[in-house]
């Protein structure tokens, strides 16, 4: 908080400890959840990003939304992207869940309405009356490439203009240089 952090985006694909270890390739779910609770206590706004996948975590779609709505956290479902090993048709097709599939599943438990979003938003945002919001980043169902204004900095110092493209620029040296 003293550093000026006002908001965090956290990737969390499940509330199941075993599944968490599989998807995250290690780590401890309880530590992540305690960290989320602590950030909320400090007044830091949180958005949680989940990539729903048919075989890996489909049963977590509603429980994670429940968790987020109970805490005033906006959950962003992100459609699976064709990246890395997921670029293989067989893997991608067995795991991909469309925006409509997500809306249908959420609709079994919640009423919701689509809300207006800023022009440069990558998410389609929905309001659950009296509960909160969730969003869907539907890069496959509703591509937004022409209006995307995002740049991404990887943990190893590369700047990406698009997650669907392998083009990147190393800026790690610039980030590491002290400023006057």
State where each predicted segment sits.
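Radical SAM/AdoMet-radical enzyme domain recognition
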Residues: 1-76
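Flexible loop residues that form catalytic
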Residues: 13, 80, 156
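Short histidine/acidic/glycine/proline-rich micro-motifs that form metal-
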Residues: 51-55, 82, 92
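Short, compositionally biased low-complexity segments
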Residues: 74-79, 159-160
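Accessory C-terminal segments flanking Radical SAM cores
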Residues: 84-180
């Amino acid at each position: 908080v003293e550093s000026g952090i006002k908001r965090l985006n956290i990737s969390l694909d499940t509330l199941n400890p075993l599944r968490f270890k599989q998807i995250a390739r290690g780590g401890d779910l309880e530590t992540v959840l305690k960290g989320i609770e602590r950030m909320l206590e400090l007044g830091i706004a949180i958005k949680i990003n989940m990539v729903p996948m048919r075989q890996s975590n489909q049963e977590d779609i509603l429980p994670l939304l429940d968790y987020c709505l109970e805490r005033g956290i906006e959950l962003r479902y992100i459609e699976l992207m064709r990246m890395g090993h997921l670029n293989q048709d067989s893997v991608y097709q067995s795991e991909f869940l469309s925006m409509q599939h997500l809306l249908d599943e959420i609709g079994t438990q919640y009423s919701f309405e689509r809300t207006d979003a800023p022009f440069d938003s990558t998410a389609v945002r929905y309001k659950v009356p009296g509960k909160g919001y969730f969003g869907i980043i539907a890069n496959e169902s509703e591509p937004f490439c022409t209006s995307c204004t995002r740049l991404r900095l990887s943990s190893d110092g590369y700047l990406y203009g698009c997650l669907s493209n392998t083009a990147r620029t190393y800026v790690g040296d610039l980030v590491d240089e002290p400023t006057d």
